[in-house]
Amino acid sequence: GGGGTSGLFAFPRV
């Protein structure tokens, strides 16, 4: 649950 970014990418963090 939550969120994060890596460079130009965003992904749902587990």
Swiss-Prot record:
- Protein's cellular compartments: Secreted
- Tissue specificity as recorded in UniProt: Expressed in the CNS and abdominal perisympathetic organs (aPSO). Not expressed in the ring gland, midgut or thoracic perisympathetic organs (tPSO) (at protein level).
Principal location class: secreted
Q: Which UniProt keywords apply?
A: Amidation, Neuropeptide, Secreted
Q: Provide a GO CC annotation, any one.
A: extracellular region
A Pfam family of this chain: Periviscerokin
Question: Which InterPro entries does the record match to this protein?
Answer: Periviscerokinin
Valine amide: modified positions: 14
**Is Magnesium one of the keywords?**
no
From the UniProt record, give one GO term of the biological process aspect. Answer: neuropeptide signaling pathway
The family this protein is said to belong to: Belongs to the periviscerokinin family.
Designated name of the protein:
CAPA-Periviscerokinin-1
